[in-house]
């Protein structure tokens, strides 16, 4: 079976092609906003529209397949930025109609999890999903990915990206922020907000900005915001691990590239004799392959959607998505 997947939830448009065993192509282009600015949804959509056909051709050439060879077309139905989502959905619908292929809707967050499981070999993990749009601890139970902790406001990736922009660091901001953090010597007091199993990062960002404006050494503020954010993630993950008794932890999403987060989570895993899996860097950020792979799992389980019903979903919780491809032997 061969599936083409299109990702376009935010700043990246990606086209991936997979078969039953491997990724055949993973071609992506990222919209880079002006220095110091965040993503403007319509500018991102314009970027995606310009790149879409070129990316489809690149992916087909890389995979050495034709559109007529596809068994189905998958697309990121949500959640995400409306204008950006519509570009990917439109391209997917066009291919589905022109070539008579089934259309498969994919939840962006589920796709991050499934590509991480596929590339690491994890079977039944507790997942720390951390990116610019997601911050949650989740695991499969009863036919869905259930949430065992999440942000109450902004994502950890958004928090750190905004602070990096405030400092004038180049895009992508988090790696440069962590480089600055490594030069820090003193941990400063910042809001550490964990309520039950939920976290808050908005106040952390605001307090860090205030410290910089007060003249505190920037490197120390970087060290403090990064470590405080990641320690919060570690606490919530550890509690969920103790509750569920999982023996695997997966870090998925763009922030999974962080070596600092990985080192902290290695400590958590070792304390519970769990195996830590981290999604490979090329599949950590938004990418087409994760949509294609999750689309393949879904389509083989009988999931497809009509053109009329393929409206994008800007807001779509991960625990609203049925997961029919995981067998009942996984609790």
From Swiss-Prot:
CDD domains for this protein: ASKHA_NBD_Kae1_arch_bac
SUPFAM superfamilies reported in the protein's UniProt record: Actin-like ATPase domain (SSF53067)
Keywords on record: Acyltransferase, Cytoplasm, Iron, Metal-binding, Transferase, tRNA processing
Cofactor(s) required for function per UniProt: Fe(2+)
GO BP annotations, alphabetical order: tRNA threonylcarbamoyladenosine modification
Gene3D superfamilies assigned: 3.30.420.40
EC number(s) stated in the UniProt entry for this protein: 2.3.1.234
Binding of substrate, residues: 129-133, 161, 178, 258
InterPro entries: ATPase_NBD, Gcp-like_dom, KAE1/TsaD, Kae1_archaea_euk
Catalytic activity: L-threonylcarbamoyladenylate + adenosine(37) in tRNA = N(6)-L-threonylcarbamoyladenosine(37) in tRNA + AMP + H(+)
Cofactor remark: Binds 1 Fe(2+) ion per subunit.
Cellular component aspect of the GO annotation: cytoplasm; EKC/KEOPS complex
tRNA processing keyword on record: yes
Cellular localisation: Cytoplasm
Residue numbers binding Fe cation: 108, 112, 286
UniProt entry tagged with the keyword Chloroplast: no
Gene Ontology MF terms: iron ion binding; N(6)-L-threonylcarbamoyladenine synthase activity
Xref: PANTHER family: TRNA N6-ADENOSINE THREONYLCARBAMOYLTRANSFERASE
Stored NCBIfam families: arch_KAE1 (TIGR03722), gcp_kae1 (TIGR00329)
Function: Required for the formation of a threonylcarbamoyl group on adenosine at position 37 (t(6)A37) in tRNAs that read codons beginning with adenine. Is probably involved in the transfer of the threonylcarbamoyl moiety of threonylcarbamoyl-AMP (TC-AMP) to the N6 group of A37.
Entry similarity comment: Belongs to the KAE1 / TsaD family.
Protein name, as recorded: tRNA N6-adenosine threonylcarbamoyltransferase
Organism field: Caldivirga maquilingensis (strain ATCC 700844 / DSM 13496 / JCM 10307 / IC-167)
């Amino acid at each position: 079976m061969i599936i083409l997947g299109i990702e376009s939830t935010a700043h990246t448009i990606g086209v991936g092609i997979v078969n039953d065993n491997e990724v055949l192509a993973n071609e992506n282009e990222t919209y880079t906003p002006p220095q110091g600015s965040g993503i403007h949804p319509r500018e991102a959509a314009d970027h995606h529209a310009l790149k879409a056909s070129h990316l489809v051709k690149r992916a087909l050439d890389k995979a050495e397949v034709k559109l007529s060879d596809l068994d189905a077309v998958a697309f990121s139905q949500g959640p995400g930025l409306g204008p950006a989502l519509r570009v990917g959905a439109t391209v997917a619908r066009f291919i589905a109609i022109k070539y008579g292929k089934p259309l498969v809707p994919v939840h962006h967050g589920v796709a991050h999890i499934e590509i991480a499981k596929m590339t690491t070999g994890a079977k039944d993990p507790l997942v720390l999903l951390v990116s610019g749009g997601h911050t949650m601890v989740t695991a499969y139970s009863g036919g869905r990915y259930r949430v065992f902790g999440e942000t109450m406001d902004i994502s950890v990736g958004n928090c750190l990206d905004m602070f990096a922009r405030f400092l004038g660091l180049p895009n992508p901001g988090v790696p440069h922020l962590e480089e600055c953090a490594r030069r820090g010597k003193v941990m400063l007091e910042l809001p550490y907000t964990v309520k039950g199993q939920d976290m808050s990062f908005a106040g952390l960002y605001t307090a860090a900005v205030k410290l910089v404006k007060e003249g505190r050494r920037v490197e120390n503020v970087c060290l403090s915001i990064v470590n405080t954010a990641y320690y919060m993630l570690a606490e919530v993950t550890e509690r969920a691990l103790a509750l569920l008794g999982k023996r695997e932890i997966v870090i998925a999403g763009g922030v999974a590239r962080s070596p600092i987060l990985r080192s902290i989570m290695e400590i958590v895993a070792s304390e519970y004799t769990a195996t830590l899996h981290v999604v490979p860097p090329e599949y950590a950020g938004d990418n087409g392959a994760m949509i294609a792979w999750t689309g393949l799992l879904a389509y083989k389980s009988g999931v497809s959607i009509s053109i009329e019903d393929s409206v994008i979903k800007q807001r779509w919780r991960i625990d609203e998505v049925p997961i029919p491809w995981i067998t009942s032997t996984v609790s």
